[in-house]
Amino acid sequence: MPPSGPRGTLLLLPLLLLLLLRAVLAVPLERGAPNKEETPATESPDTGLYYHRYLQEVIDVLETDGHFREKLQAANAEDIKSGKLSRELDFVSHHVRTKLDELKRQEVSRLRMLLKAKMDAEQDPNVQVDHLNLLKQFEHLDPQNQHTFEARDLELLIQTATRDLAQYDAAHHEEFKRYEMLKEHERRRYLESLGEEQRKEAERKLEEQQRRHREHPKVNVPGSQAQLKEVWEELDGLDPNRFNPKTFFILHDINSDGVLDEQELEALFTKELEKVYDPKNEEDDMREMEEERLRMREHVMKNVDTNQDRLVTLEEFLASTQRKEFGDTGEGWETVEMHPAYTEEELRRFEEELAAREAELNAKAQRLSQETEALGRSQGRLEAQKRELQQAVLHMEQRKQQQQQQQGHKAPAAHPEGQLKFHPDTDDVPVPAPAGDQKEVDTSEKKLLERLPEVEVPQHL
């Protein structure tokens, strides 16, 4: 359920609407009835910004200060964008400032770790670092002060979030274009891999899927009278002959903040999207459905949101219903498949890019394979030399033992008077091998060491 109370009040302002992260969430296919009762705030959806967590934590802390919340409710979009609201930070409580200081220190520490990781990666010549994007990681912080959260930090955070989220839709369109080009590229490669008969059958199946996808009820133009009346009748359960724009606006202002934000607008397009896309159908692509939802929302914002603050007020909404285009049904809404996301030239460049990346990956894989084979050969030589050395040492030990045994089996020398004469105990004195045998052992050891080649080990994989 959408938040109410102070958090709902934030949605009155275009920037903090974005900061509360409602602009980029895809709405569910079903929506419950409005509930005006106070409910606990739910976790906000992720914007996709790399500083999302920091942004959300700053908002949560500022909301706890009564003075700042009061100024926020009285501020307008220009006050926020110009930095006027940021100066109110000087009047928040010491407890809140302390929390903000700690949040900033944590964010600085996070970015330092990120910088260190990228610098380490830069040491590897095979890794390329985008220095421009690296610098952008710090644009939402005041570089002159890394310890305390000041008005300049709030101003930078607001400006950066406003700019980044304004570019979100363009980035989404570009991502969808690459998705469509990759899908077409893989389709063509698949067809090329088939025999003539199999290719004809695959093409026939694809054409049949495209035909089924095109066969759908007429899609009304988003924001038109026909589209809103359909929501009024089928979703709200009201008499289409008694359609009232003001009542419609109030019904679909879910959090009762006096404006329709982007999420509330996108909820109005659900019935139109269901005419074209069904997740159960093989021919319906859900990625295309989300692109369609975005196109519909952009169309309404372009024609209704006159001050371009990404919010639709009641006055703007009522004014749009007075225009000629509001009641003009025409041919209906042209869906995504009627507007190709890319040209053949863009597809050609995309395929060249894919081929270059594939060649680079293959070259790296080949180098890795060669280095692995070289390491395997070196390891094999090491193992062979180790076994040879072990055998040589064992052989020498056996020769020494044999010599000692032969020495021990010799009879004791006889005394001239016919009595045996035993020598005193000589355990502590080493008994040298006969000169000939010792020379032979030394020669064997020397030859063994000379035969051991130097081992060359690859420096890296």
UniProtKB/Swiss-Prot annotation:
InterPro entries: EF-hand-dom_pair, EF_Hand_1_Ca_BS, EF_hand_dom, Nucleobindin. Its main location: Golgi. Residues 193-221, 368-461 are annotated as: Disordered. Discovered as DNA-binding protein in the serum of lupus-prone mice. Residues 42-51 are annotated as: O-glycosylated at one site. The gene is NUCB1. Ca(2+) 2 binds at residues 305, 307, 309, 316. Residues 228-321 are annotated as: Binds to GNAI2 and GNAI3. A motif (GBA) lies at residues 303-333. It comes from Homo sapiens (Human). Keywords: Calcium, Coiled coil, Cytoplasm, DNA-binding, Glycoprotein, Golgi apparatus, Guanine-nucleotide releasing factor, Membrane, Metal-binding, Phosphoprotein, Repeat, Secreted, Signal. One of its GO terms (cellular component) is Golgi apparatus. This is Nucleobindin-1. Belongs to the nucleobindin family. It is a peripheral membrane protein. Expressed both in fetal and adult heart, lung, liver, kidney and brain, and in adult skeletal muscle, placenta and pancreas. PROSITE patterns: EF_HAND_1, EF_HAND_2.
